[in-house]
UniProtKB/Swiss-Prot annotation:
<feature type="topological domain" description="Cytoplasmic">
    <location>
        <begin position="1"/>
        <end position="50"/>
    </location>
</feature>
<feature type="transmembrane region" description="Helical">
    <location>
        <begin position="161"/>
        <end position="180"/>
    </location>
</feature>
<feature type="domain" description="CBS 2">
    <location>
        <begin position="620"/>
        <end position="678"/>
    </location>
</feature>
<feature type="binding site">
    <location>
        <position position="259"/>
    </location>
    <ligand>
        <name>Ca(2+)</name>
    </ligand>
</feature>
<feature type="intramembrane region" description="Helical">
    <location>
        <begin position="464"/>
        <end position="496"/>
    </location>
</feature>
<comment type="similarity">
    <text>Belongs to the chloride channel (TC 2.A.49) family. CLCNKB subfamily.</text>
</comment>
<protein>
    <recommendedName>
        <fullName>Chloride channel protein ClC-Kb</fullName>
    </recommendedName>
</protein>
<keyword id="KW-0868">Chloride</keyword>
<feature type="transmembrane region" description="Helical">
    <location>
        <begin position="500"/>
        <end position="520"/>
    </location>
</feature>
<dbReference type="GO" id="GO:0034707">
    <property type="term" value="C:chloride channel complex"/>
</dbReference>
<keyword id="KW-0406">Ion transport</keyword>
<comment type="subunit">
    <text>Homodimer. Interacts with BSND.</text>
</comment>
<keyword id="KW-0677">Repeat</keyword>
<feature type="transmembrane region" description="Helical">
    <location>
        <begin position="325"/>
        <end position="342"/>
    </location>
</feature>
<keyword id="KW-0325">Glycoprotein</keyword>
<dbReference type="InterPro" id="IPR001807">
    <property type="entry name" value="ClC"/>
</dbReference>
<feature type="binding site">
    <location>
        <position position="278"/>
    </location>
    <ligand>
        <name>Ca(2+)</name>
    </ligand>
</feature>
Length: 678
């Protein structure tokens, strides 16, 4: 039924819907609507992207700060309960373990009941999406609440589980970016654009890192390295603008809440600026990078192997399929019991928060030299002025506690990564790297108690500088990124160790990238997500490989002059999502692509004509409205492996057809690329 129309009073005859005439205050409503349209035109004259990117940064900063503010009080409440519950070891043990076990169980159960996409880091799935793969419902805004609640419960466990929030927060930021992208499309009234959507997603990923660490530069660069192998320069300003807005608002909220006097870095250090390190120490920084590279290879291999074991073991896989909260509770019980302070946790500084772990590890004083002639006490509660005392035990010494911390956290973090709940794994890796650097720095301070002589000047060794380099090197090696060096500088506000830290990161990455896939790529492989495998180490013999060596030989084509019975036979005998369309059976000249779903729909509509006995061919179906897609890019059998790989990465393609003199030959996809052996 058509809508009734009328004429406005005093109009020249332009019709208007009666619903608008009969609505309350029609003139006022028209005036407000016109004013809003005028305001939108004026504001969007400079570009609508600025407003949505700024909104994205501010929203994520508010969420990040509110989460930190609330969870900080929850963690303090847990510590108060543990402190005030009495001297009974049983009660203290229960107060230490039951709290995180309950939170982890709720986090796993709640998030998994709402959506199965909320568990884990989220970065591997985002990397898959940005490579051109569509993961249904992964970025829906309805998943936002499940991720926030689950992540909040995970972080409320404190250092008991030793998990962070970088990965899940990047996922949250990308979900908000996708939602704002849809709002932007409706606001300006344009059609949905895939490239515009990806621009917002990339900016959202950068904002996620920036609002966790208040580090806009490293946030953008880290996402460039981790999320994609090729990055459009056009997206640079979007990422930096949104990340800067988010980082600025995040630190500004701390000033407004009287937590800081002004905008400063998250972790304060006091490295001397005049001579932070001697020239001979460069060798030890490079050695530290090599150690972190080897350690990262061991960690990546063990983590990927154990994660695959949990998916193939019958008992664990059944438990994960039927009762994820139970598995989470069992794993949390093990982790919480080990960190119980009067027990083994005494030798792991388990009473410190993750922030306090980094604050103490970045201390520029040598603990080994300070405890050489005196033993500091182990207070009933951590002393805010001497938090480093938590790392000392008269029987273990500083070296024993640091080594024990590394050994235990190594496998405990691997176990924690298998718990199906929202959690980040970057900050724990960063702290483990800082402990590796601290251990080497303490050893050097004992070996050279007066410092290293260089140019006739003796300067003491600062273990905190080695901790900073170790944190950047190990986390960079695990994630295959160089920007962790810049992240270390932004976190501490110090750049005096720029050269040695960067050299350590480069040495660690050189070893890790030649031996193991990154943490996120390994997770993609274990989860069997669609991915384009990287060419590891780019060996020289890989340049001799051409498409003809690994292309798919069998291919089903549809000719324009093919009878419908032959088309139906091809559809029923294969399950391809799309078929190459050729000019004729004899010529095999590739002219387009037809989608399976659209072709099946067209054939179903053609069923009455076929039943009447009319002889029809595929050309009749195509002329009747079945859409075809043009072939804009093809490969040659002589195209090299590296050229094909770069095309897949640059254009976010999943498959390409191979033609010879215009004739459709074969088909190449990610699957064939995986079988090349490089």
């Amino acid at each position: 039924m058509e809508e009734l129309v009328g004429l406005r009073e005093g109009s020249s005859g332009n019709p208007v819907a009666l619903r608008e005439l009969w609505s309350p205050c029609p003139r006022l409503r028209r005036g407000i609507r016109g004013g809003l349209e005028w305001l939108k035109q004026k504001l969007f004259r400079v570009g609508e992207d600025w407003y949505f990117l700024m909104t994205l940064g501010v929203l994520m900063a508010l969420i990040s700060y509110a989460m930190n503010f609330a969870l900080g009080r929850v963690v303090r409440a847990h510590k108060w309960l543990y402190r005030e519950i009495g001297d009974s070891h049983l009660l203290r043990y229960l107060s230490w373990t039951v709290y995180p076990v309950a939170l982890v169980s709720f986090s796993s159960g709640f998030s998994q009941s709402i959506t199965p996409f909320s568990g884990g880091s989220g970065i591997p799935e985002l990397k898959t999406i940005l490579s051109g793969v569509v993961l249904e419902n992964y970025l829906d805004i309805k998943n936002f609440g499940a991720k926030v609640v689950g992540l909040s419960c995970t972080l409320a466990t404190g250092s008991t589980l030793f998990l962070g929030k970088v990965g899940p927060f990047v996922h949250l930021s990308v979900m908000i970016a996708a939602y704002l992208g849809r709002v932007r499309t409706k606001t300006i009234g344009e059609a949905e654009n895939k490239s515009k959507q990806n621009e917002m997603l990339v900016a959202g990923a950068a904002v996620g890192v920036a609002t966790v660490f208040a580090a806009p530069f490293s946030g953008v660069l880290f996402c460039i390295e981790v999320m994609s192998s090729h990055f459009s320069v056009w997206d640079y300003w979007r990422g930096f603008f949104a990340a800067t807005c988010g980082a600025f608002m995040f630190r500004l909220l701390a000033v407004f809440n009287s937590e800081q006097e002004t905008i400063t870095s998250l972790y304060k250090t006091s490295f001397p600026v005049d001579v932070p390190f001697d020239l001979p120490e460069i060798f030890f920084f490079v050695l530290l990078g090599a150690i972190c590279g080897v350690a990262s290879c061991a960690y990546l291999y063990c983590q990927r192997t154990f994660l695959a074991f949990t998916k193939t073991n019958k008992l664990i896989s059944k438990l994960m399929a039927t009762s994820k909260p139970l598995y989470a509770a069992l794993a949390a019980t093990v982790l919480a019991s080990i960190t119980y302070p009067p027990g083994v946790g005494r030798f792991m500084a388990s009473r410190l928060s993750m922030r306090e772990h980094l604050d103490t590890l970045f201390d520029n004083h040598s603990w080994a030299l300070l405890t050489r002639n005196s033993s500091p006490p182990w207070p009933a509660e951590p002393d805010p002025q001497h938090l480093w005392w938590e790392w000392y035990h008269p029987r273990f010494t500083i070296f024993g506690t640091l080594a024990f911390f590394l050994v235990m956290k190594f496998w405990m973090l691997i176990l924690a990564t298998t718990i199906p709940m929202p959690a980040g794994y970057f900050l724990p890796i960063f702290i483990i790297g800082a402990a590796i650097g601290r251990l080497l720095g303490e050893a050097l301070s004992v070996a050279f108690p007066e410092g290293i002589v260089a140019g006739g000047v003796i300067n003491p060794i600062m273990p905190g500088g080695y901790a900073l380099a170790g944190a950047a090197a190990f986390s960079g090696a695990v994630t295959h990124s160089i920007s962790t060096a810049l992240l270390a500088f932004e976190l501490t506000g110090q750049i005096v160790h720029a050269l040695p830290v960067l050299m350590a990161v480069l040495a660690a990455n050189a070893i890790a990238q030649s031996c193991q896939p990154s943490f996120y790529d390994g997770t993609i492989m274990v989860k069997k997500l669609p991915y384009l495998p990287w060419i590891r180490g780019r060996p020289i013999n890989s340049h001799r490989v051409i498409v003809e060596h690994f292309m798919r030989r069998a291919i089903s084509t549809l000719a324009r002059d093919a009878a419908l019975e032959q088309v139906v036979k091809v559809l029923t005998s294969t399950d391809e999502a799309e078929y190459p369309l050729v000019e004729s059976t004899e010529s095999q000249l590739l002219v387009g692509i037809v989608q399976r779903a659209q072709l099946v729909q067209a054939l179903q509509a053609e069923a009455p004509a076929r039943a009447s006995g009319q002889q029809r061919c595929l050309q009749d179906i195509l002329a009747g409205g079945c859409p075809t897609e043009p072939v804009t890019l093809t490969l040659s059998p002589e195209t090299s492996l590296h050229q094909a790989h770069n095309l897949f990465e640059l254009l976010n393609l999943r498959s390409l057809y191979v033609t010879s003199k215009g004739r459709a030959v074969v088909y190449v996809s990610w699957v064939e690329r995986q079988h090349t052996g490089f």
